[in-house]
Amino acid sequence: MASIAYLGPAGTFTEGALLQMTDAGMVPQRGGGDWRPLPVDSTTAALDAVRDGAADFACVPIENSIDGSIMPTLDSLAIGTPLQVFAELTLDVAFSIAVKPGRTAAEVRTLAAFPVAAAQVRQWLAAHLPAAELRPAISNADAAQQVADGLVDAAVSSPLAATHRGLSTLAEGVVDEANACTRFVLVGRPGPPPARTGADRTSVVLRIDNAPGALVSTLAEFGMRGIDLTRIESRPTRTELGTYVFFLDCVGHIDDDAVAEALKALHQRCTDVRYLGSWPTGAVAGAPPPPSDDAARWLAGLRGGAADGSAR
């Protein structure tokens, strides 16, 4: 039975994303078709559980539409034993303001919130609960648990976490920006990537020599092959001031010839290339890499003795 670590306790948005992934059959089969949830107290702990062998996979948030990338996830993927992404799911996110039954907004003096959640409802809180003292929580479910335990008056929480703990809500669908969403990924130990679907994402972490034009030359390996880069982000190496690694996402799969050629070029050009995987996205988000069949046939023609590269 496969085990999947996730940011717990029960009722987090991460658990909701994990349930949707498993229902959709997005989890690779390891040890049979059943799986066991393993709630942990941070995204870093979830990824470390995979590295340590305590879990087969981890479901972790990697990006949200309000604040961008989830830095603890990126930093953990960039260092330590390599891990690989096998699936992703984007979840619409809206929060509930959870309280004990019978409590009113006028009685709310303290409010618990996971920092990522607090950032997404900052304007709403300023308008509706301006006097509430904000207290940290390690997850949306933990915020709800603090209400249930009587530690705070209210919580910014997921609807699922509030329901699990028998709480009422002062407001539902709370979010500063309409259509807010979070992208979650399923991460495991390295293995064969999911099959190419035509709507795929490939991600790498690069260490590049500190030399003039090094980054431009690296990015050119994608541009010259018609590969659409969808994310470029730098993070400190944590080993020396002023040194960085670069996260790059592109449209395409390692089995696309253009992407494969770019990866080979990166291996030759960069100090280090960490392959984070190629996996389906469900929908094409950008321009897919161009097919190289025509070029391959032309080259085969030349090898066969045709002066113009035409097949003989």
Labelled PLM ranges:
Residues 1-312:
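Domain-level signature for soluble enzymes in the chorismate/prephenate branch of the shikimate pathway
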